Amino acid sequence: MFRQSIRPLVSNRLTFIRYNSSPAYTAAVSLLKGDLKKAMIAKDEMKKTAIRNMLSAIKNKEIALKGKSADEYSLYDMYSKLISQRKDSINEFLANKRDDLVAKEQGEMDIIKKYMDQLPVSSELDIDQNVKKLLDALKTKAGEKKVQIKEIMGEIDWKSLPTEWKTSPTAIKNSIVKQFKEIFK
């Protein structure tokens, strides 16, 4: 009896998080659920497994947010993390000569990339171009002075820049770290 009275509260809290989220986030989750149904009807095991893993990661992220709203940028970060996990697994399987598992992981990674490309977020190439412009401007501002990466991170307005560039702060940070050595040699 106690379990029945508590269960609706937990469900309502997670539903509130999803309704409190951005429209792009809600549309992406509903697209995943619809495609899961289609994959189940078509008996496409690889697509079904990949989408279930993605929905599971989304649900875990919603629980971890504890009432904060989610957006398409957090989905982008989550998809990036899932893709990097697949890449690591592929490298492990190649080292152990497990070609069957390599093909499975590659197929799941392709499915995740397809959904990642559908998000209304800037591409990695656009992010890299914007970061290059930003780092060039900071380099001319600094002149001959030696600049460290923490100073660059401090110069950036993290509240407005992700919305201007339509990307997540994590993607911007990764691009800055990647391009810092090339520009500030």
Curated annotation (Swiss-Prot):
Effect of inactivating the gene: Increases frequency of mitochondrial genome loss.
InterPro entries registered for this protein in UniProt: Asn/Gln_tRNA_amidoTrase-B-like (IPR003789), YqeY/Aim41 (IPR019004), YqeY/Aim41_N (IPR042184)
Annotated organelle transit peptide span: 1-53
GO CC term (a single one): mitochondrion
Keywords: Mitochondrion, Transit peptide
Pfam families, A to Z: YqeY (PF09424)
Subcellular location: Mitochondrion
Annotated signal sequence range: none
GO molecular-function term, one example from the UniProt record: carbon-nitrogen ligase activity, with glutamine as amido-N-donor
Gene3D superfamilies: Uncharacterised protein YqeY/AIM41 PF09424, N-terminal domain (1.10.1510.10)
Family: Belongs to the AIM41 family.
PANTHER family: ALTERED INHERITANCE OF MITOCHONDRIA PROTEIN 41, MITOCHONDRIAL (PTHR28055:SF1)
Additional facts recorded: Present with 2870 molecules/cell in log phase SD medium.
Name by which UniProt lists this protein: Altered inheritance of mitochondria protein 41, mitochondrial
Native species: Saccharomyces cerevisiae (strain ATCC 204508 / S288c)
